């Protein structure tokens, strides 16, 4: 397994692979890898000749009061996981390699970024789309693998790839959970023992909403109330948003008539966690 830090070097390797007509599966990450990332890598390994994982904590997708400086990093552990699951190349550039000068060019995806995390984290998806555009241009993958836990990100990236004619297939992979239901996340490392226990309220509240939908509830306000009521029973939980949106357009819906995304963002202590599920009539 190669670990490469420069655009020049990684392009030389990729040119060789492309000359040999090899397919490339790409998993973009910010590192501190867990079983969720491993599931993406395994899927990429199954479907491609070569697998690349990028590890880069992207500064331009963090707001001024967010956790860029404290985001967990552990390249040794990450490298071990990548090697275990058959990654061919880790691309781990320095910030100065990706952004050697002040960046004037940004990628925005309208409409899909108006709600959910896009509303609560201004500039976040501009940063995500800009860095992924750079990675797609540098790495030239055949397929890219993203987790469904970041459902809005997945929808936004799919639309960006479609609109800008990237010759890349975007593959969404299911949420991976702990045995007690908590969605796997690098930010779970921030939680102390009590917060970790309290964080289970996210999945529990979504389960209640899912049960109501399966029992025939079609009013989105009622579904939202079920989730809010459950979350409010947890003293350490502070709601950032609870949204029921169309799963394609990500626009709010009042009456549930087609496929919807039920998405929540909740602070447990100082840690912001997200979770979701999709429901189809």
Swiss-Prot record:
The keyword Ligase applies. It is an enzyme of class 6 (ligase). GO terms for cellular component: cytosol. It catalyses: (R)-pantoate + beta-alanine + ATP = (R)-pantothenate + AMP + diphosphate + H(+). Keywords: ATP-binding, Cytoplasm, Ligase, Nucleotide-binding, Pantothenate biosynthesis. Its main location: cytoplasm. InterPro entries: Cyt_trans-like, Pantoate_ligase, Pantoate_ligase_C, Rossmann-like_a/b/a_fold. It holds the Pfam family Pantoate_ligase. It comes from the Bacteria. Beta-alanine binds at residue 61. Its EC number is 6.3.2.1. Pathway: Cofactor biosynthesis; (R)-pantothenate biosynthesis; (R)-pantothenate from (R)-pantoate and beta-alanine: step 1/1. It is found in: Cytoplasm. ATP binds at residues 30-37, 147-150, 176, 184-187. The active site is at 37 (proton donor). The keyword Nucleotide-binding applies. GO terms for molecular function: ATP binding; pantoate-beta-alanine ligase activity. (R)-pantoate binds at residues 61, 153. GO terms for biological process: pantothenate biosynthetic process. Homodimer. Catalyzes the condensation of pantoate with beta-alanine in an ATP-dependent reaction via a pantoyl-adenylate intermediate. HAMAP family: PanC. Belongs to the pantothenate synthetase family. The reaction proceeds by a bi uni uni bi ping pong mechanism. This is Pantothenate synthetase. The lineage of its organism: Bacteria, Bacillati, Bacillota, Clostridia, Eubacteriales. The gene is panC.
């Amino acid at each position: 397994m190669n670990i490469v830090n420069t655009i020049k070097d990684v392009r030389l390797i990729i040119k060789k692979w492309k000359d040999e007509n090899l397919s490339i599966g790409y998993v973009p990450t910010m590192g501190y890898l867990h079983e969720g990332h491993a599931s993406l890598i395994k899927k990429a390994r199954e479907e491609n000749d070569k697998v690349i994982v990028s590890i880069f904590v992207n500064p331009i997708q963090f707001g001024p009061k967010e956790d860029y400086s404290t985001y967990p990093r552990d390249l040794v552990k990450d490298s071990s996981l990548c090697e275990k699951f058959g990654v061919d190349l880790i691309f781990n550039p320095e910030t100065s390699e990706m952004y050697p000068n002040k960046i004037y060019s940004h990628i925005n995806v309208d409409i899909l970024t108006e709600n959910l995390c896009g509303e609560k984290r201004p500039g976040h998806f501009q940063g995500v789309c800009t860095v992924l555009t750079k990675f797609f241009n540098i790495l030239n993958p055949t397929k890219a693998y993203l987790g469904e836990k970041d459902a809005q990100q997945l929808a936004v990236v799919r639309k960006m790839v479609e609109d800008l004619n990237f010759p890349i297939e975007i593959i969404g992979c299911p949420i991976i959970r702990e045995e007690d239901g908590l969605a796997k996340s690098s930010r779970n490392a921030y939680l102390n023992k009590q917060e970790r226990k309290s964080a289970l309220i996210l999945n529990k509240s979504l389960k209640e909403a899912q049960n109501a939908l399966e029992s025939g509830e079609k009013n989105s306000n009622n579904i939202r109330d079920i989730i809010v009521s459950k979350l409010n029973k947890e003293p350490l939980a502070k709601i950032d948003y609870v949204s029921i949106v169309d799963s394609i357009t990500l626009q709010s819906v009042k009456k549930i008539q087609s496929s919807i995304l039920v998405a929540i963002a909740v602070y447990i202590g100082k840690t912001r966690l997200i979770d979701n599920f999709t429901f189809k009539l």
